[in-house]
Structure formats: C-alpha cells, structure tokens
Amino acid sequence: MAYWLCITNEDNWKVIKDKKIWGVAERHKNTINKVKVGDKLIIYEIQRSGKDYKPPYIRGVYEVVSEVYKDSSKIFKPTPRNPNEKFPYRVKLKEVKVFVPPINFKDLIPKLKFITNKKKWSGHLMGKAMREIPEEDYKLIIEAKA
C-alpha cells in the first residue's frame, strides 16, 4: 500500500468530497498510473492568498477503490491557467476520514519527513498534482488534531 498527498483547490475539494473521485491532468498521467486499489490519498487544499486568505489545509483521507480510468466529463473546475482542463485520469474513492474543522498543514511541517526543507516547504508540492509520502507521515497526518 502507498500513501499519497493530493493537491487541490477549494472548488475541487468539494467535487472530491461529493463525488468520491480524484482526477489529475494529462501531464500527471504517469504519477496517477502508480496508484493502486487500497492506496490512501490525503487531500491537501492549497492556501488562498490576498484578502480572502486561507491557510493550506488537510481536508480528508480516502481509500482508492478503482483502477485508474480515463473520463473527460467536466466535473472538476479548471484552473485559470488552463481553462480547458478536465482532469481526465481518475480513480474512485471511499471516504476514510474528513477533518471538520480541517487541519492546518503549516502546523504539521516541522514533523513531516518528506518535507526536508522546512523553510521553503512549498517547493515539495509545487507543480505536482500528487506525491507519494512515507507511511509515518501518513500516520502523523491522520492522527493530527485541527
């Protein structure tokens, strides 16, 4: 079993939660193709800057219950940089835990092993849709308190 941190925005977090589907862009096809049934996905919501500032959150944990499949139906909201993106490479999910309130990701950074540069931590996530994390980081996250 593998553990994945999946990076999304607030709008697509709502889609993941409601439809129990995770999807990535074409350019991340090779990454999602490593995902197997039974793997755990931790949903990370990016921070929002400006006057509507929100910190980065851990929103929930899901188990993968399907093989990767391609579906170009428009259920996810595209990013402003790529307005035609449909995130077609997808897996179906089963909810393990949704954090209410969500967990502030910044509080976890000092303890997470996969983040080796604690000052420039966002570099470990930039440009990625998802990344594999160690089991001990997964356990730390799911046991965290908001």
From Swiss-Prot:
It comes from the Archaea. This is UPF0310 protein MJ1382. It comes from Methanocaldococcus jannaschii (strain ATCC 43067 / DSM 2661 / JAL-1 / JCM 10045 / NBRC 100440) (Methanococcus jannaschii). Belongs to the UPF0310 family. CDD domains: EVE-like (cd21132). The lineage of its organism: Archaea, Methanobacteriati, Methanobacteriota, Methanomada group, Methanococci. Pfam families: EVE (PF01878). PANTHER family: UPF0310 PROTEIN MJECL36 (PTHR39661:SF1). NCBIfam families: PRK00809.1.
